[in-house]
A protein has these predicted regions:
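A helix-coil-helix interface module used to build multimeric assemblies
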Residues: 4, 9-206, 212
Length: 212
């Protein structure tokens, strides 16, 4: 198995280099951000494959160790998508197949590239949204603290660019804190939407394998 065999868009003719560069030029760079999530999704997928009998316990153990080894390489910055390899999904499968033989090819059983990509993106979004929620909560707590700290410090309240009534710096900080409450609800809602597993949709019309 060589890298060029993992290129899905290879249809037996040489593509126009300018068109290829325009359409997929940044794909590998962007895919690198999904690498650890691809491994994470594959670890869950092979556990399911063993559960329904498509993998033996020995194969599951072997593949799990292989995927965790790749995850360590990603974390250490030693993982790269080879020039002739389509994307991160193909690269992970290629590395497993080189190291483990035919067992490496089995990780694609019961899933399509379509739902595999969606899994990676949802895991990525879920992680990013969690970090965003943590950052917003930190800012909210800080503003709430400043609101309490400066609640007795007066400042003018304006309306239509004119001084309207007495206010305080505490109320000013608190107002900004309150605006973040809705933001945190929106982030939480987005996280719940991202936290849905698309595996099983395969290429778009379900999998013929009765996956769990």
């Amino acid at each position: 198995l060589v890298g060029s065999e993992m290129c899905i868009r290879d249809r037996g003719f040489e593509p126009d280099k300018m068109i290829e560069e325009y359409t997929v030029g940044d794909d590998r760079e962007l895919d690198m951000r999904l690498a650890k999530y691809d491994v994470e999704g594959s670890l869950a997928h092979i556990a399911m494959l063993e559960k329904i009998g498509l993998l033996t316990s020995a194969e599951l153990e072997e593949l799990t160790a292989g995927l965790k080894e790749i995850a360590a390489e990603i974390e250490a910055g030693r993982f790269a998508i080879e020039p002739d390899t389509e994307d991160v999904h193909s690269q992970v499968e290629l590395m497993l197949t080189r190291r483990l033989g035919d067992a490496g090819k089995k990780i694609h059983s019961g899933r399509s590239r379509n739902d595999q990509v969606l899994v990676d993106l949802k895991l990525f979004l879920r992680d990013e949204l969690r970090q965003t929620a943590d950052a917003v909560k930190t800012l909210f707590d800080r503003l709430q603290g400043l609101s309490e700290q400066y609640k007795e410090v007066l400042m003018p309240g304006y309306t239509h660019l004119q001084i309207a009534m007495p206010s305080s710096f505490g109320l000013w900080f608190g107002a900004y804190a309150e605006t973040l409450v809705d933001d945190m609800r929106l982030v939480a809602a987005a996280w719940h939407i991202a936290n849905q597993n698309p595996l099983g949709s395969a290429a778009g019309y379900l999998s013929l394998i009765h996956i769990s």
